[in-house]
């Protein structure tokens, strides 16, 4: 026997989680619903590998020579850098570029899978998580962007989220670029300062307009005494940026009119406002007014996207870790990224897409009671009373007959006695067990114990002797009638569950 000191400690790496059967089944049911909507819209599934050449991930990497921050990377035997994918969009761009001549254009696809971030883990922040994306590559006009927003709205509603509990919020990178150009931050030379402005606007929900004003100016001192240096904009520029974030009106038409006033005279800004107006017209034509909203405060990802940008936000309250009521917030986002595929081809390739955070959306559905986490019915367990080869074959035939009839079943393969086997069946959430000892075998019979009904009756029969003598919820049937008898029990249990769920 190995010395205690030689035992390896079982430990899960930080930032990763194990997933249990109920979570896996609930996630699969949720993703099946998402697939139904995407299929309805005419999108096709595609799957890319978890590993890509590091240079294919492009702008996500801070250091191409030592790609060990932000992504998990390693070198193969010919010393080329490979990385676990950071998201699902960069691999799609590589796939489209590599198969460009054979794919239909526009190319409409969806995919779900694990992505990895080599970042410091924390509460709700993992190094491995699931995303579900849909993208259209090769469509230059905003009808493709509008379709993404409408598809996301339909997806949330198909999952059981009611209108009024969510909003798809839409902005446009070109409008903000017009504002930044107007305050003198045009060109690559101001890229760092532009990014600081974007980050300041992104804090609008957290700090409010006055907090953003400080971050756009000299900086902000928080309650703990920490100082965040600001973007150092002059007062007139700050007012211009804040006017942009406050341009939201009572409806889409008013918001668009406000934005037109903010960017008047700037060609790029005016182009962005017109794109929003075109999208708004499509939302109205499709019956999505009130579900999709033009909102200038949406800036998440604007440093990455090239045109329309959108975010799916859930509007109901939840209690956070500090016991405070807060709006649940974002469960997905996307936008137009016309530059990503072009990196591989040297020619313009327009693209737009949307990404859902699967784990976060599951949490939201759980809070709403809309996630299907109902207990899965376990397998019928055939108990093994006699372990000789001949009788094992008889038990095996029973379980095979049940499976052929489409009934989930297993034969106990452990080494314990009947009491332990019954405990095992209970832990497996078995609906019933099949028992055949020597007496039943000689009579050509089997006993079937309904564990669900047995639990219910046990609460009514308090005396142990009476319980044992009455053998509640246990029947004896001919061995050749096993399948029909088990099916009757399962059907009765299904009717009871349906009645209880009403």
UniProtKB/Swiss-Prot annotation:
InterPro entries in the record: aa-tRNA-synth_II, aa-tRNA-synth_II/BPL/LPL, Anticodon-bd, Anticodon-bd_dom_sf, His-tRNA-ligase, HisRS-like_core, HisRS/HisZ, HisRS_anticodon
GO annotation (BP), single: histidyl-tRNA aminoacylation
Localization per record: Cytoplasm
Tagged with keyword Protein biosynthesis: yes
Primary site of residence: cytoplasm
Example of a GO MF term: histidine-tRNA ligase activity
Presence of the UniProt keyword Ribonucleoprotein in the record: no
The protein's Enzyme Commission number: 6.1.1.21
Subunit structure: Homodimer.
Protein name as annotated: Histidine--tRNA ligase
Species in which this protein is naturally found: Brucella canis (strain ATCC 23365 / NCTC 10854 / RM-666)
């Amino acid at each position: 026997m190995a010395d205690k000191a030689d035992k390896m400690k079982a430990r899960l790496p930080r930032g990763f989680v194990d997933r249990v059967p109920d979570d896996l089944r609930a996630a699969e049911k949720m993703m099946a619903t998402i697939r139904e909507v995407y299929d309805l819209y005419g999108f096709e599934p595609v799957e890319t590998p978890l590993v890509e050449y590091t240079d294919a991930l492009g702008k996500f990497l801070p250091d191409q020579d030592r790609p060990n921050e932000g992504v998990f990377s390693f070198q193969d035997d010919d010393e080329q850098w490979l990385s676990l994918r950071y998201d699902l969009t960069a691999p799609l761009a590589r796939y489209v570029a590599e198969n460009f001549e054979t794919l239909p254009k526009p190319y409409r696809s969806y995919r779900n899978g694990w992505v990895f971030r080599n970042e410091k883990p924390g509460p709700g922040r993992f190094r491995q998580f699931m995303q579900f994306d849909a993208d259209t590559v090769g469509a230059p006009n905003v009808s493709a962007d509008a379709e993404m927003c409408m598809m996301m709205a339909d997806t949330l509603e198909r999952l059981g989220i009611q209108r009024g509990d969510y909003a798809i919020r839409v902005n446009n990178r070109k409008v903000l670029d017009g504002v930044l150009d107007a305050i003198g931050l045009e060109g690559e030379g101001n890229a760092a300062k532009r990014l600081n402005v974007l980050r300041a606007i992104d804090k609008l929900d957290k700090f409010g307009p006055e907090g953003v004003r400080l971050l756009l100016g000299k900086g902000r001192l928080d309650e703990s005494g920490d100082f965040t240096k600001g973007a150092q904009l002059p007062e007139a520029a700050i007012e211009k940026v804040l006017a942009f974030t406050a341009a939201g009106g009572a409806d889409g038409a008013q918001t668009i009119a406000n934005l037109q006033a903010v960017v008047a005279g700037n060609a790029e800004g005016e182009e962005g406002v017109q794109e929003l107006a075109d999208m708004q017209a499509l939302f109205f034509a499709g019956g999505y007014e009130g579900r999709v909203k033009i909102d200038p405060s949406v800036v998440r990802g604007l440093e990455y996207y090239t045109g329309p940008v959108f975010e799916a936000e859930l509007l109901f309250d939840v209690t956070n870790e500090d016991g405070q009521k807060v709006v649940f917030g974002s469960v997905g986002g996307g936008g137009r990224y016309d530059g990503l595929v072009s990196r591989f081809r040297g020619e313009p390739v327009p693209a737009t897409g949307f990404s859902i955070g699967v784990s976060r959306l599951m949490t939201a559905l759980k809070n709403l009671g809309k996630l299907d986490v109902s207990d899965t019915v376990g397998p019928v367990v055939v108990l093994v009373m006699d372990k000789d080869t001949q009788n094992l074959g008889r038990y095996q035939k029973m379980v095979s007959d049940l499976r052929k009839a489409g009934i989930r079943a297993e034969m106990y393969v452990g080494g314990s006695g009947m009491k332990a086997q019954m405990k095992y069946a209970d832990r497996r959430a078995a609906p019933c067990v099949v028992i055949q000892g020597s007496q039943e075998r000689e009579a050509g019979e089997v006993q079937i114990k309904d564990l669900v009904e047995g639990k219910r009756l046990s609460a009514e029969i308090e005396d142990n002797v009476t319980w044992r003598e009455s053998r509640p919820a246990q029947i004896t049937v001919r061995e050749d009638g096993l399948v029909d008898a088990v099916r009757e029990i399962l059907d009765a249990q299904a009717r009871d569950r349906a009645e209880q769920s009403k």
